[in-house]
């Protein structure tokens, strides 16, 4: 597929564009280039895995209300149990019956392309929506933003093919919003999640893509919208500060450069790429608990 800004690429088709590097693969290169190479060699497109998916279902409810029925399916376990008991009232475990399994298999077969959730997850998502809509700023940002733009472009520095898919872009304020769901959305917990899952690198690639593709001429704000999946369902905007943006952008460019060199040379290094000497020798840093 050619570079450009696309509105209607299905998520599975987006992930299948392997010529373009996304943040997930760049994160692998941070560990080692060989880690990325091994991942790519063993990757296969298994399609969307059908499992209870609170995060993606909530995102659809928040950003694509017109297509909820086309993108989300809600399980009918109670109906399946009732049908199984109607067939055999003596069943002690209806969910293990042939009738139940057939109804369940048919449901999943009929909804292969949809996100699957239970009625209780649907209730949670509705509470999460209430929390977002009760905040005037969040409500305004969501209502006035474009969602799920797929950006494919060549890195301005290296020419490497890159891709990103911001959740929301608010053109008027030149703001990117990334939606995250969490069991605990407190500042203490979310800051740890940011580090562990490297959300800043993902954010930096989104900023780079929006700017280098020309979608925006400036990104004034980058927010993570973090919504808790259970009571009290707090919805919070966290700002990616300009100082941190600059630091992470430098790191992102560094790893993009490493990937580009490996692609062109065919040489994929291991952990020795982290060495500060030409020999590739690493100084072992013993953990603090060992020093006590």
Identify the function of each model-found stretch:
Residues 186-192, 234-238:
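Short acidic, glycine/proline-rich loop/turn micro-motifs
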Residues 195-204:
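Gly/Ser/Thr-rich active-site loops/lids in small-molecule metabolic enzymes
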């Amino acid at each position: 597929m050619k570079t450009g800004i696309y509105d209607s690429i299905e998520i599975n088709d987006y992930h299948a564009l392997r010529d373009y590097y996304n943040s997930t693969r760049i994160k692998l290169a941070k560990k080692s280039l060989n880690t990325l190479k091994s991942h790519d060699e063993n990757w296969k497109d298994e399609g969307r895995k059908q499992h209870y998916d609170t995060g993606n279902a909530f995102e659809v409810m928040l950003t694509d209300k017109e297509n909820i029925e086309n993108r989300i399916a809600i399980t009918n376990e109670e109906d399946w149990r009732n049908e199984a008991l109607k067939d055999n009232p003596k069943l002690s475990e209806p969910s293990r019956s042939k009738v139940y399994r057939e109804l369940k298999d048919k449901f999943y077969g009929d909804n292969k392309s949809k996100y699957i959730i239970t009625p209780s997850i649907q209730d949670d998502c509705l509470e999460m929506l209430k929390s977002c809509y009760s905040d005037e700023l969040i409500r305004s940002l969501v209502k006035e933003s474009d969602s799920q733009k797929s950006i494919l472009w060549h890195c301005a520095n290296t020419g490497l093919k890159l891709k990103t898919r911001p959740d929301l872009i608010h053109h008027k304020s030149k703001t990117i919003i990334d939606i995250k769901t969490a069991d605990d959305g407190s500042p203490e917990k979310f800051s740890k999640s940011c580090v562990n899952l490297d959300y800043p690198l993902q954010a930096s690639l989104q900023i780079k893509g929006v700017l280098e593709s020309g979608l925006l001429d400036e990104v004034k704000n980058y927010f993570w919208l973090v919504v808790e999946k259970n009571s009290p369902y707090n919805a919070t905007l966290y700002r990616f500060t300009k100082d941190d943006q600059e630091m992470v952008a430098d790191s992102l460019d560094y790893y993009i450069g490493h990937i580009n060199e490996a692609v062109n040379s065919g040489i994929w290094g291991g952990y020795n790429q982290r060495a500060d000497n030409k020999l590739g020798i690493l100084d072992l840093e013993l953990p603090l608990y060992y020093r006590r």
